[in-house]
């Protein structure tokens, strides 16, 4: 008999551990980026004691939303308040259907008064594109996640996203910048300059 809810799924499997350990789903493939550059142990030690660079450019979609109704589209379709959503900040965004069903979640950045970018999984981007056709004055641009298996073909993104993490991360950031960089607060954006151009700096705890 098939399970009707999560508790029945857990009961039939014998518990959470057995359910996850014996899952028939394959491993999630992060596109383009190798699983390890040296080995897992050395990379975890570096993460704990110095600094590591994560390439997070490829596994999420970017949905660019702009126009006079951009904020209205977001406000009408999400459970989050946008009353204090300032430019150069970000927030967790959770859109829901008119009936209240959760579509998914992701990170929403406010780049200008009428310019936003959603970063996350495809279902939310698909839903926002659908809702945008229902009377909103907005422009939408979708930057799909990178293919899991590019088969040697060049992979490009509209945005490249990197995470520097570890106790010496800020040293790395300031060395790249060539001077002091103002510390950012939770989900706020700052800017730094590196030789190849301009980068945004965001703190997420």
How would you label these PLM feature ranges?
Residues 107-204:
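Acidic, low-complexity central loop/insert segments
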Residues 1-96, 101:
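Acidic, proline/glycine-enriched N-terminal capping motif
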Residues 48-51, 105-106, 204:
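Generic recognition of flexible, low-complexity loop/linker segments
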């Amino acid at each position: 008999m098939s399970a009707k809810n999560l508790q029945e799924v857990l009961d039939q499997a014998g518990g959470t551990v057995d359910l996850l350990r014996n899952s028939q789903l394959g491993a999630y493939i992060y596109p383009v980026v190798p699983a390890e550059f040296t080995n897992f142990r050395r990379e975890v030690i570096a993460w704990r004691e110095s600094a590591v660079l994560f390439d997070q450019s490829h596994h999420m979609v970017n949905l660019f939303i702009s126009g006079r109704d951009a904020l209205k589209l977001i406000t009408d379709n999400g459970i989050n308040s946008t009353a204090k959503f300032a430019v150069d900040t970000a927030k967790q965004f959770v859109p829901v259907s008119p009936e209240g069903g959760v579509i998914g979640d992701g990170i929403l950045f406010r780049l200008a008064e009428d310019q936003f970018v959603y970063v996350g999984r495809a279902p939310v981007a698909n839903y926002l594109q659908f809702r945008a056709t229902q009377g909103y004055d907005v422009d939408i641009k979708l930057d799909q996640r990178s293919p899991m298996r590019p088969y040697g073909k060049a992979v490009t993104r509209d945005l490249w996203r990197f995470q520097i993490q570890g106790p010496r991360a800020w040293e790395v950031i300031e060395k790249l910048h060539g001077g002091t960089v103002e510390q950012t607060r939770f989900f706020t954006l700052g800017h730094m300059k590196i030789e190849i151009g301009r980068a945004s700096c965001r703190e997420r705890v």
